[in-house]
A protein has these predicted regions:
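Generic marker of residues within folded, mature protein domains
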Residues: 168, 240-241, 267, 390, ...
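Conserved S-adenosyl-L-methionine
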Residues: 193-299, 304-306, 311-315, 320-325, ...
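A structure-centric signal for secondary-structure junctions around beta-strands
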Residues: 34, 175, 218, 245, ...
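A conserved structural/catalytic subdomain of Rossmann-like adenosyl-cofactor enzymes
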Residues: 5, 285, 291-518
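Non-catalytic, mostly N-terminal accessory regions of nucleic-acid modification and defense proteins
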Residues: 1-206, 210-211, 215, 273-282, ...
Length: 518
């Protein structure tokens, strides 16, 4: 079986388990249990691997909790960020799950213990609340303790049965891949709400490559609307670890999604000291403002959401929004996210942000913000994508690429609306499509019906309209008509009609002649 076949089989198993164990509970409402169990297994195996340190004579899961000294525990927490006693490991709990009448209470105690092990250590903020959504007392699991334990046991046994290989034999990516697959499927089945926390991997790949283009190294990468962390992790997947020197940063407003993002970091083997995901409203309660600016920013913020805007008189003086001289409309926060990202961008940095297309041509405050961006030469490229690439919306969105190190004053426009492959319910970008977009992005050369670099003066003369269709002429797919050939065909047709009329007249005359003779 090839690696692709193995992965496909693993995905089939995971989704079958996710559907089997949830019973009559909606998959979206049950996701935290399956995802949480997978995470629990991962950190257990990860921790065991660390404690065994390659010594085959040590089997950490078989050790007695009592042999763990305070020094051993302290050293492990400083390195891994948390501590798990042998009895608390996933494999030991799952092995007895079916016969444990206190399973829900035991799981809750274990999760509390894992989180509390980080108290007072640098990892505390990264570990705190990780299992908050794995509510072992929820009625979603059943109405009685027995029902709850039965459902929890089914989840643990299902995840236990997944063939994720030997943790030490380079199978670590299987955990992260399995987690991303689950999140992707939950998002696809959740419709609009799913699109709010997960960016499809094929689009994430393009965004990450745009933000990281030409960089031999970046200090760190940031997503102000992190969701489940999928965009940040694409940067890790497609670039060597040493390129991103100080790690992965993000902020997320939804508590459940915030926990998913932190779990996602761990599951992709990013240690606690290499990521910092914060909870809160990016626009009104921003974190990381005191950090060094970011060399790479990626984001797929919510489209045209409402925000407090001008109702908060202090925001116009906020260093993120003040330079533009105007706030994004209260009913459409899109440009608030753009200005936030720009403020956090370093002098050598580049940001790639998914945007609702209306912000590129509407008037009012949005036009003034576009003027600020263009006049200060921050807009490198605007890319229009094909429709139906994202979960929960069929809208053809755009990607805005901002840069603080442009070498000319032109703005590049790329029409990628025809670059897609149709799949079951959504369109996708193939690797060939992404490569084609990146080639024209890098070269900045004009290609008919695909890309055009426009002078600053042209954009100004067009009232700072940044809509791709205003600059890249769409391909005319109408049939080209040869007028001379058409006239010749008409002449021939008319001649044939005239001859037919003569023939008909002759036949009619012959018939009438016959009737007269009678």
């Amino acid at each position: 079986m090839t690696s692709l076949q193995q992965r496909a089989e693993l995905h089939r198993q995971i989704w079958a388990i996710a559907n089997d164990v949830r019973g009559s509970v909606d998959g979206w409402d049950f996701k935290q249990y399956v995802l949480g169990a997978l995470f629990y297994r991962f950190i257990s195996e990860n921790f065991s691997s660390y404690m065994e340190a390659g010594d085959e004579s040590i089997h950490y899961a078989a050790l007695d909790d009592s042999i763990i000294t305070n020094d051993i525990k302290d050293d492990a927490i400083r390195t891994k960020g948390y501590f798990i006693y042998p009895s608390q490991l996933f494999c030991n709990v799952a092995a007895k799950a079916n016969s444990n009448d206190r399973l829900n209470a035991d799981l809750n105690s274990i999760f509390v213990a894992i989180e509390s092990s980080a108290y007072g250590y640098p990892s505390e903020a990264d570990i705190k609340g990780l299992f908050a959504d794995f509510d072992t007392t929820s009625n979603r699991l059943g109405n009685t303790v027995k029902d709850k334990n039965s459902r929890l046991a089914a989840v643990l046994k299902g995840v236990e049965g997944l063939n994720l290989g030997n943790f030490n034999e380079h199978q670590i990516d299987l955990f992260g891949d399995a987690y991303e697959f689950l999140i992707s499927n939950y998002a696809a089945n959740a419709g609009k709400s799913g699109g709010e926390f997960f960016t499809p991997q094929h689009v994430s790949k393009l965004i990450a490559q745009l933000a990281m283009h030409g960089q031999t190294h970046v200090n760190k990468i940031y997503d102000p609307a992190a969701g489940s962390g999928s965009l940040l992790l694409q940067a890790k997947k497609h670039f060597d670890n040493h390129i991103i020197e100080e790690g992965f940063y993000g902020q997320e407003i939804n508590h459940t999604t915030f926990n998913l993002a932190r779990m996602n970091m761990f599951l992709h083997n990013i240690n606690y000291d290499k990521f910092d995901i914060r909870l809160g409203n990016t626009l009104t309660e921003p974190h990381f403002g005191d950090e060094k600016p970011f060399d790479a920013i990626v984001s797929n913020p919510p489209y045209s959401v409402k925000w407090i805007g001008s109702d908060d008189p202090t925001l116009i003086n906020d260093e993120r929004f003040a330079p533009a001289g105007v706030l994004a409309p209260k009913s459409k926060a899109d440009f608030a996210f753009v200005l936030h990202a720009l403020n956090y961008l370093s002098a050598k940095g580049r940001a790639a942000i998914v945007c609702f297309p209306g912000i590129f041509y509407r008037g009012g405050a949005e036009q003034k913000i576009r003027q600020y961006l263009v006049d200060n030469n921050y807009v490198e490229t605007v890319i229009s994508l094909a429709p139906n690439l994202f979960f929960g919306t069929t809208i053809a969105v755009n990607i805005l690429v901002l840069s603080k190190h442009k070498t000319d004053t032109k703005v590049q426009f790329i029409d990628a609306s025809e670059l897609f492959k149709k799949e079951t319910n959504n369109n996708i970008l193939t690797d060939a499509h992404i490569e084609q977009i990146m080639q024209v992005f890098a070269s900045k050369e004009d290609v008919a019906h695909l890309t055009k670099s426009v002078t600053f003066e042209t954009v100004v003369a067009n009232d700072y309209n940044l809509s791709v269709s205003s600059y890249v002429e769409a391909k005319d797919n109408r049939e080209i008509i040869d007028i001379a050939e058409l006239n010749a065909e008409l002449k021939t047709t008319v001649s044939k009609i005239d001859q037919l009329r003569k023939d008909i007249d002759a036949i009619v005359a012959e018939i009438e002649g016959c009737e007269v003779q009678k």
